């Protein structure tokens, strides 16, 4: 079996920055304990499990405000997906120490929404409902931001001004966003468009679109909650025309997927630890359908190998 290692793949700078911020927090003895992450720091359970070993507690729930209600003391880390001003204010009122690990690309979108609100605009925001990134973006100005996920959402959308800005969740499929923007243009011809697909998401999607078409199958390594991982599988199937499966790690690979497969492409979401992806590639590389000794699919990567290394500051 030939392995097509799609490049680029895996971690983006926003994810690495967020994890380094959280690791440094774990090592900082001056921070009030306990230390919580408000939601998953990035959408990967292997990462959150590794942080649990570091003594950082991940709390998840329907919304950031509801999660925050569970916390009465200590330190709170805001995830790479960003949070609303209301969440920041609530944390301040509760006397919590806060650390912001918001991805710079997400912050840029928040700043854009604030600027356009000041100019009297309404904002159409293309994103996934119940995902933390749109939750934070809508929370910047809930009175003028309208979340849409699909074309059907436009049917009932009415906006009381011609001053309209259209932007989007950074991890969406660029093709889906483009199609929705075309639909929006038809209904709101005066709308201004500001596509915010982050560069890391864009180049990973384009790599799959261009490189997966030579494969019989694409394996996307990523957490089920990772929107960008799910979009990579979608791009493989809809743009490259190659059947795709998303797996959290090697243990989720089904042998029947590999029947008759000669070329398999492998990519990974922006929040997927590199050792987890390498383990998937190693399994596929040695797999022989005629040799049961090569069929074992067990994740063996230790949690201490999941997180990026940080330098421990020496005490003065």
From Swiss-Prot:
Reaction(s) catalysed (UniProt annotation): isopentenyl diphosphate + 2 oxidized [2Fe-2S]-[ferredoxin] + H2O = (2E)-4-hydroxy-3-methylbut-2-enyl diphosphate + 2 reduced [2Fe-2S]-[ferredoxin] + 2 H(+); dimethylallyl diphosphate + 2 oxidized [2Fe-2S]-[ferredoxin] + H2O = (2E)-4-hydroxy-3-methylbut-2-enyl diphosphate + 2 reduced [2Fe-2S]-[ferredoxin] + 2 H(+)
Positions of the catalytic residues: 133
Binding site for isopentenyl diphosphate: 43, 81, 131, 226, 228, 271
Enzyme Commission code(s) on record: 1.17.7.4
Residues where dimethylallyl diphosphate binds: 43, 81, 131, 226, 228, 271
Regions crossing the membrane: none
Pathway(s) served: Isoprenoid biosynthesis; dimethylallyl diphosphate biosynthesis; dimethylallyl diphosphate from (2E)-4-hydroxy-3-methylbutenyl diphosphate: step 1/1; Isoprenoid biosynthesis; isopentenyl diphosphate biosynthesis via DXP pathway; isopentenyl diphosphate from 1-deoxy-D-xylulose 5-phosphate: step 6/6
Protein residues bound to [4Fe-4S] cluster: 12, 103, 198
Swiss-Prot/TrEMBL keywords: 4Fe-4S, Iron, Iron-sulfur, Isoprene biosynthesis, Metal-binding, Oxidoreductase
Record flagged with keyword Transmembrane helix: no
GO molecular function annotation: 4 iron, 4 sulfur cluster binding; 4-hydroxy-3-methylbut-2-enyl diphosphate reductase activity; metal ion binding
Pfam families attached to this UniProt entry: LYTB
Signal peptide range in chain numbering: none
Family to which this protein belongs: Belongs to the IspH family.
Function: Catalyzes the conversion of 1-hydroxy-2-methyl-2-(E)-butenyl 4-diphosphate (HMBPP) into a mixture of isopentenyl diphosphate (IPP) and dimethylallyl diphosphate (DMAPP). Acts in the terminal step of the DOXP/MEP pathway for isoprenoid precursor biosynthesis.
Name the UniProt record assigns to this protein: 4-hydroxy-3-methylbut-2-enyl diphosphate reductase
Organism: Bacillus cereus (strain G9842)
């Amino acid at each position: 079996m030939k392995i097509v290692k799609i490049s680029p793949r895996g971690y983006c700078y926003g994810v690495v920055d967020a994890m380094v911020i959280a690791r440094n927090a774990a090592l900082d003895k001056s921070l009030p304990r306990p230390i919580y992450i408000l939601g998953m720091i990035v959408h990967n359970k292997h990462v959150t499990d590794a942080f649990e070993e570091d003594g950082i507690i991940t709390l998840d729930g329907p919304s950031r405000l509801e999660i925050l209600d569970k916390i009465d003391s200590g330190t709170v880390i805001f995830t790479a997906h960003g949070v609303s001003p209301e969440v920041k204010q609530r944390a301040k009122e509760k006397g919590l120490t806060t650390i912001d690990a918001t991805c710079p690309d997400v912050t840029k979108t928040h700043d854009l929404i604030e600027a356009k609100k000041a100019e009297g605009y309404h904002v159409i925001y293309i994103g996934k409902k119940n995902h933390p990134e749109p939750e934070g973006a809508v929370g910047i100005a809930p009175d003028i931001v309208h979340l849409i996920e699909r074309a059907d959402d436009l049917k009932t959308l009415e906006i009381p001004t011609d001053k309209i800005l259209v932007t989007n969740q950074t991890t969406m499929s660029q093709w889906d966003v483009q199609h929705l923007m075309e639909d929006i243009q038809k209904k709101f011809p005066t709308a201004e468009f500001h596509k915010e697909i982050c560069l890391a998401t864009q180049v990973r999607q384009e790599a799959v679109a261009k490189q997966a078409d030579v494969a019989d199958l694409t394996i996307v390594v990523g957490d089920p909650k990772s929107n960008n991982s799910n979009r990579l599988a979608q791009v493989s199937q809809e743009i490259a025309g190659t059947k795709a499966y998303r797996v959290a790690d090697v243990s989720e690979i089904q042998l029947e997927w590999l029947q008759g497969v000669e070329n398999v492409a492998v990519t990974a979401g922006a929040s997927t630890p590199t050792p987890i992806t390498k383990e998937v590639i190693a399994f596929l590389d040695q797999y022989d359908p005629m040799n049961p000794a090569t069929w074992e699919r067990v994740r063996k990567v230790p949690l201490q190998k999941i997180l990026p290394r940080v330098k421990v500051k020496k005490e003065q």
